[in-house]
Structure formats: structure tokens, C-alpha cells
Design a protein with these regions (language model features):
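Hydrophobic packing within well-folded, soluble alpha/beta domains
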Residues: 39, 57, 61, 65, ...
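Active-site phosphate-binding strand-loop segment of PLP-dependent enzymes
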Residues: 102-181, 186-189, 193, 290
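Conserved coil-to-alpha-helix start sites within the AMP-binding
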Residues: 79-84
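PLP-dependent aminotransferase class I/II
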Residues: 33-37, 45-48, 109, 121-125, ...
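N-terminal "arm"/small-domain region of PLP-dependent enzymes with the aminotransferase-like
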Residues: 1-26, 30, 343
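Short beta-strand->loop structural element characteristic of the AMP-binding/adenylate-forming
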Residues: 93-103, 306
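Phosphate-binding glycine-rich loop
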Residues: 25-72, 86-90, 96-98
């Protein structure tokens, strides 16, 4: 079976974890601030705050821009569900706006139209590693929180690296991401006060300079462990190479599949935008077999694929609790119904990519 994803891990990560275990300092040690500083420097941010997951990072970032009970946050319905869930954590309401059919990111015009007097923030998602049009969204007015969980290495058309613009930008390190710490995330920050607040809130509301077990604000256990930070430091050393390998694999896919009639491929880099390759997704032809049938048929051929991603507003919770219905976001619904992720990781060989593409063409009858 060709898997959907595989992390790049080796003896260096093993040695880094073993060194932490032998030190006896498994949490709140020296590796976390080192990882934060190196990661922030990599993306061009003033500060970094390491957290237990991308979801935790989104939650804290939304709190830091003032999202609270009864507020509205405009975001994309085409994302992993955590983007919307983090809004609901603060008893705010996710207000979805449709996506651009080419980039699959939040459409700035649709987002602007969704803003009301109750809108406290806009949360664009850099979907599949392609940079959202944050410069346009910044002009709409409300503060921006960037879901960059899939976008490490991405660059905006104006040359700014995703994470460097001063907005809270949240990265994630799940095993299928551009780099991994197993679980874990990091908030890139451009504001000194937000760094102080996030560092306290991830640690149960206790700032580093406070007395032991004194807490001056509501907080959470959103800490990253020393083992995760140690892995992250090694992964940062590998990152440029892993990003280059991912781009090479994506190029193979695009070259082989470019002539398949009706098959929509990821949009290429254009106008200065550079994708930080996270996954390679395609959209099944509209007159082809159902997406879920394609996934099953590919598995029968020894190839793992996944529906990627279902529309958030059509998930049971968001239908039942927030009242969303089919037909509200037609671009998202069309893309979500046809989109699948193909196997994608740095170690894929050209022969394996050819095998995947051949199987896909056979399954969709092209």
C-alpha cells in the first residue's frame, strides 16, 4: 500500500528525544524557547509561541485579537474543521464566506460582504499551502488571524513570507505536515504584549515571572513538551530539503496529470505567490465517478487517498447547531464533493507517482 503521508524521521530525531529523556526535564525546559526563536526567525516573525497543537494555537490567537462570546468571525468553509471549532471555543459564531474557485482560499470580496458590526476577526486559511490573499483581507478592516497550519514555506505575491506580516499566524506540526513534532503547533506573533499573553494562557494563565502557582488570567494546558521541541529543532535543520523534495514530487504529479481531461489540478504558483506544499489534491471530473467511489477503487489498487476536504458547513454539528444548509456556498460545495488527496510525502519516488497517476486515470476512465 502506498500511504497517504509519511514523516521524514531519522537517527537525529531519535538522539534528540533520548537526550531530553536523559536530562529529566520533559516540560518547560530550554529547548522550547530555542525552538520558538528559530522557527520565528525562519518565517520572519518577531516572536513564536509553541503550543500543543494547531487547534490550540488558533484558539489562543483568536482570544488575543479580542474574540469573545457573541462575536462573529468570518472564515472559510473549505478547511479542516479546527478552523471553525476554534471560533466556537470562545462562544463566537463562525460566519462562512465562499472560496475562490482557483486558489480554493477565502474570497476577499465574499469575506468583505460577510462582515457585520459584530465581526471581531477574519480567519483566512492558507489552504493546502497556497497563500491566501491576506493583503486584500487586511484592507477589509477587522483583525486577521491566519490559519497557516498547512502553509509553512509559503510566500505571498508581495514577497512576504506567510507568518511574517505581524498578524497572529498559526502553524501545525502533525505528522503529515511540512515538518513534524508528532503533535504540536506554534503561533507566529508580531506583538510583544500578545507574546506575553499567549505564553501565560498556554500555561494555565501563569506568566513566567509570577510566583509558583499564582495565576492572573484564565489559561489552558496548551504546552508543547521538550521532546516535541527537540524533534522540531532537528526538523528545522531538514526543512529546506523537505520543502524542495515536496515541490519536486508535486511537479511530477502535475506533469503526468496535466493532460487528463476534466481533472482539476492544484493552481500553479503565479503572480509571485509561492505554495508551501502540504498535500497534492485533485478534483475528480464533474462527469466522472463519485469521489468516494474513486477513493475505494484506489484502495483496491493498493493506493491510499482521502476525501480532502469535506465542507465544514455541511458537517452534522454545523448543520444542527449553527443552521447551515446546502446551497449556501456553491463553490465550496462543488470543490469539496470532488476533491481527493493523493499520496504525498518527500520520499515518494517518480515510479510511485507514475503508479498513482496510472491508477487514477484507470479509475476515472481517462
Amino acid at each position: 500500500m502506498i500511504p497517504i503521508a509519511r514523516p521524514v524521521l531519522g537517527a537525529e530525531e531519535e538522539a534528540a528525544v533520548l537526550a531530553v529523556l536523559r536530562s529529566g526535564v520533559l516540560s518547560l525546559g530550554e529547548r522550547i524557547p530555542e525552538f520558538e526563536q528559530r522557527f520565528a526567525a525562519y518565517v520572519g516573525a518577531r516572536h513564536g509561541s509553541a503550543v500543543s497543537s494547531g487547534t490550540a494555537g488558533l484558539h489562543l490567537a483568536l482570544r488575543e485579537v479580542g474574540v469573545t462570546d457573541g462575536d462573529e468571525v468570518v472564515t472559510s468553509p473549505f478547511s479542516f474543521v479546527a478552523s471553525a471549532n476554534a471560533i466556537v471555543f470562545e462562544r463566537a459564531r463562525p460566519v462562512f464566506a465562499d472560496i475562490d474557485p482557483v486558489t480554493l482560499n477565502l474570497d476577499p470580496q465574499a469575506a468583505a460582504a460577510a462582515v457585520t458590526p459584530n465581526t471581531t476577526a477574519i480567519l483566512p486559511v492558507h489552504i493546502f499551502g497556497f497563500p491566501a490573499d491576506v493583503p486584500a483581507l487586511e484592507k477589509v478592516g477587522p483583525p486577521i488571524v491566519e490559519d497557516a497550519c498547512e502553509a509553512l514555506g509559503a510566500v505571498h505575491a508581495d514577497g512576504s513570507v506567510v507568518g511574517s506580516r505581524g498578524n497572529p499566524a498559526v502553524f501545525a506540526f502533525y505528522p503529515n505536515k511540512q515538518m513534524t513534532t508528532g503533535e504540536g503547533g506554534l503561533i507566529a506573533l508580531g506583538d510583544d504584549a500578545q507574546k506575553v499573553a499567549v505564553d501565560a494562557e498556554r500555561n494555565q494563565g501563569r506568566a513566567p515571572d509570577m510566583d509558583w502557582l499564582d495565576h492572573d488570567r484564565l489559561g489552558f494546558n496548551y504546552r508543547m513538551t521538550e521532546m516535541q521541541a527537540a524533534i522540531g529543532l532537528v526538523q528545522l535543520d531538514r526543512l529546506d530539503g523537505m520543502l524542495a523534495d515536496r515541490a519536486r514530487v508535486a511537479g511530477w504529479y502535475s506533469e503526468i496529470l496535466s493532460g487528463v481531461e476534466g481533472l482539476d489540478l492544484p493552481c500553479p504558483d503565479a503572480d509571485g505567490n509561492v505554495r508551501g506544499w502540504f498535500v497534492y489534491t485533485v478534483q475528480i471530473p464533474k462527469d466522472g465517478p463519485a469521489r468516494d467511489d474513486v477513493v475505494r477503487a484506489m484502495r483496491e489498487r493498493g493506493i491510499a487517498t482521502k476525501p480532502y476536504l469535506p465542507a465544514i458547513h455541511l458537517m452534522s454539528y454545523y448543520r444542527e447547531v449553527h443552521g447551515y444548509r446546502e446551497g449556501e456556498f456553491p463553490v465550496t460545495e462543488d470543490v469539496a464533493a470532488r476533491s481527493i488527496a493523493l499520496p504525498f510525502f518527500p520520499q515518494l519516488t517518480h515510479g510511485e507517482v507514475e503508479q498513482v497517476c496510472g491508477a487514477l486515470r484507470a479509475v476515472i476512465g481517462r
